[in-house]
Amino acid sequence: DDCIKPYGFCSLPILKNGLCCSGACVGVCADL
């Protein structure tokens, strides 16, 4: 998926470089 671990939970969608973590995704958006 577009997320990397293990830095907590995305409580809200977080956009980074066009990718988005949903609230269910563990971690932060991948820096790709």
Swiss-Prot record:
Keywords carried by this UniProt record? Amidation, Disulfide bond, Hydroxylation, Ion channel impairing toxin, Knottin, Neurotoxin, Secreted, Toxin, Voltage-gated sodium channel impairing toxin
Outcome when changing residue 13 to A: 2-fold decrease of activity. Exists only as a trans isomer
Which sequence positions carry the modification called Leucine amide? 32
The record's listing under InterPro entries reads: Conotoxin_d-typ_CS (IPR012322)
Q: Which residues carry this modification: 4-hydroxyproline?
A: 6
Q: In which tissues is it expressed?
A: Expressed by the venom duct.
Under the heading PROSITE patterns, the entry gives: DELTA_CONOTOXIN
Q: Does the keyword Transcription apply?
A: no
Principal localization? secreted
The terms describing its cellular component in GO are: extracellular region
Q: Where in the cell is it found?
A: Secreted
Question: Does the record carry Hydrolase as a key word?
Answer: no
Any one GO MF term held by the record is: toxin activity
Disulfide bridge map: 3-21, 10-25, 20-29
Q: What is known of its domains?
A: The presence of a 'disulfide through disulfide knot' structurally defines this protein as a knottin.
Question: What family, per the record?
Answer: Belongs to the conotoxin O1 superfamily.
Q: What does this protein do?
A: Delta-conotoxins bind to site 6 of voltage-gated sodium channels and inhibit the inactivation process. This toxin inhibits sodium channel inactivation in neuronal membranes from amphibians and mammals (Nav1.2a/SCN1A, Nav1.3/SCN3A and Nav1.6/SCN8A) upon binding to receptor site 6.
Further details from the record: Negative results: does not affect rat skeletal muscle (Nav1.4/SCN4A) and human cardiac muscle (Nav1.5/SCN5A) sodium channels. Exists in two forms, due to cis-trans isomerization at 12-Leu-Pro-13.
Task: State the protein's name.
Answer: Delta-conotoxin EVIA
Identify the species of origin: Conus ermineus
